[in-house]
Amino acid sequence: MLDIQLLRSNTAAVAERLARRGYDFDTARFDALEERRKSVQVKTEELQASRNSISKQIGALKGQGKHEEAQVAMDQVAQIKTDLEQAAADLDAVQKELDAWLLSIPNLPHEDVPFGKDETENVEVRKVGTPREFDFEIKDHVDLGEPLGLDFEGGAKLSGARFTVMRGQIARLHRALAQFMLDTHTLKHGYTEHYTPYIVDDTTLQGTGQLPKFAEDLFHVTRGGDESKTTQYLIPTAEVTLTNTVAGSIIPSEQLPLKLTAHSPCFRSEAGSYGKDTRGLIRQHQFDKVEMVQIVHPEKSYETLEEMVGHAENILKALELPYRVITLCTGDMGFGATKTYDLEVWVPAQNTYREISSCSNCEDFQARRMKARFKDENGKNRLVHTLNGSGLAVGRTLVAVLENHQNADGSINIPAALQPYMGGVAKLEVK
């Protein structure tokens, strides 16, 4: 959520920055709401002053034996009380309308984010590794994976399209990847591992910005009868739960940064993605991801963003996978981000790079929603900055390992860094 004081003091500048990311901020609507709010507040202050003045007169009138005049004054105070209640209701209505609108407004892009309308105008930062030149006809991960235990028909039979069953060697490789990622982040990068719920309420999703904007992208569950019926949601990413662990908190500054990680399934309806990536693991309703979250001092957040990109890169390097880093342009950034880097891994069968990690700085956008603060060196409570990044998407990493490390006979070479997690197995072979 944007800072309302910033909106009030720099409305035109905020509107201009939002326009850079393709959001049309309705300044006329905002000005009208502000006028209504100010009008009600002025009326409230006038009523309160009048009530206080008349209340003082009542005692004096009674002391002078002027009971009829005192009664008239008491009737006036009673009417003022009614008027104040109405003014409070009017102010509450204006504030609720303003708050609901603020929840739908995206974050402001950082000044150094490249301007662009969509993903075609993202900017490549660097490429790492050289895509392998194969001397045989390559297969995609579906054809490679099915003989090794990747079962798309089984997933569809159980749950419908975009679900997958894994068994045997593939299931073990999938688990090994997640464990390797977690160990790297906890043992080498200093994150604390978490296990968090997979089902959350709407307040939690509002805190990280998924609600109310992206309700159609979420899976929800309903429980209880008619009177006690409640709706909750399956998490689209562990960013939601990890970040919300500090909701409502005041963190001593010496405890920052907080570095959190978790391996979890993620559930997404993929609304608007009909017909895209219908083959294979690239786009699933349920997929696993190892998430990184950092809660930091505001002055450290952009330094931390670069650090988190490096943490994700370390996984790709260890797995010997070619990749590139790109800066998302203003028109392609996520709702809550001020700046985002995507890491894209080389997918040989598609002859292109595909997203495998997204690392974002949200500055105080999420913290303001969650009321997540820290106490600075002067004892003042200030909003923290929050960052999140994939470290990595496990299914897409599996795709990359299968395709980049395939052999002509359909076997898969296991990267050396991953072999200890596979019981020393150096190659997956069709049995």
Swiss-Prot record:
UniProt-annotated binding residues for ATP: R268, S269, E270, E355, I356, S357, S358
Annotated positions binding L-serine: T237, A238, E239, E291, S390
InterPro entries: aa-tRNA-synt_IIb (IPR002314), aa-tRNA-synth_II (IPR006195), aa-tRNA-synth_II/BPL/LPL (IPR045864), Ser-tRNA-ligase_type_1 (IPR002317), Ser-tRNA-synth_1_N (IPR015866), SerRS_1_N_sf (IPR042103), SerRS_core (IPR033729), tRNA-bd_arm (IPR010978)
Entry GO CC: cytoplasm
Pathways involved: Aminoacyl-tRNA biosynthesis; selenocysteinyl-tRNA(Sec) biosynthesis; L-seryl-tRNA(Sec) from L-serine and tRNA(Sec): step 1/1
EC number(s) stated in the UniProt entry for this protein: 6.1.1.11
Taxonomy, superkingdom: Bacteria
Location relative to the cell: Cytoplasm
Entries under PANTHER family matching the protein: SERINE--TRNA LIGASE, SERYL-TRNA SYNTHETASE
Protein name in the entry: Serine--tRNA ligase
Lineage: Bacteria, Pseudomonadati, Pseudomonadota, Betaproteobacteria, Neisseriales
Gene: serS
